[in-house]
Design a protein with these regions (language model features):
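Ribosome large-subunit tunnel/peptidyl-transferase-proximal elements
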Residues: 1-231
Length: 231
């Protein structure tokens, strides 16, 4: 796997001046003042994170994918949609974890309005009222559509760049949701339960990490199906 990681540029870290102290043991060295990540450790971290995700999937538990940086948005969205799990790939809505009951009520409201709209039940209202409902649906969908199938807090959150997603990591810690994260050399690993230290700003490196998480989740789902057959 080291060759694959090397091929996608996973070993490239940030400049020496940007390297976080918590990353010291994961950096092989510096070349032209740029951190070179120790990929042997990255392999072990990937295996540990994959085993964790696989176990959750086998137990039928749901994960949440988060990647709001430009390089990660499409990758995260496509991966989540392929697994039919919730995701955030534009902007984290503060309180999604720590104020979950309120967020859940807004998701329920979105479903209620869309259901009434689809059944034509909103047509009994005035045009002005219908316009207000339409605007409310659009506003709710903007932030909550990708979370529409989330009925409770996830069993884990998979994050791209825990420095950029510091609020997500902080909220997860407060509600005891384990964090799996692809973390570059500038990241603080505090609050990250399953760190995978590698290039978190390169599309190919991000894709590799996300693919491994998807692969692990699907393997866990397959394990669950096989267990049912043999039970």
């Amino acid at each position: 796997m080291i060759k694959e990681l090397f091929a996608v540029g996973a070993h490239f870290g940030y400049s020496k001046s940007r390297s976080h102290p918590s990353m010291r043991s994961f950096i092989y060295g510096f070349k032209n003042q740029q951190a070179v990540i120790d990929l042997e450790q990255t392999v072990g971290q990937l295996e540990r994170a994959s085993a964790f995700i696989r176990g959750l999937a086998m137990e039928g538990k749901e994960i949440l994918l988060v990647g709001n940086k430009i390089e990660a948005m499409n990758i995260v969205r496509q991966a989540a949609e392929s697994l039919d799990v919730p995701y955030v790939a534009s902007r984290w809505l503060g309180g999604t974890f720590t104020n979950w009951p309120q967020i859940k009520s807004r998701i329920d409201r979105m479903h209620e309005l869309k259901d009434k709209r689809d059944k034509g039940e909103l047509s009994v209202y005035t045009k002005k009222e219908q316009l207000l409902f339409s605007r409310e649906i659009s506003r709710l969908e903007r932030y909550l559509l990708s979370l529409s199938n989330m009925t409770k807090l996830p069993a884990a959150v998979v994050v791209i760049d825990p420095m950029q997603e510091a609020i997500v990591v902080s909220e997860a810690g407060k509600v005891k949701v384990p964090v799996v994260a692809l973390a570059g050399s500038d990241c603080n690993l505090a609050g990250v339960n399953y760190p995978v230290v590698a290039n978190d700003s390169n599309v190919k490196s991000i894709q590799f990490f996300v693919d491994k998480m998807v692969e692990a989740y699907r393997a866990g789902q397959s394990d669950a199906r096989e267990a049912k057959v043999t039970a």
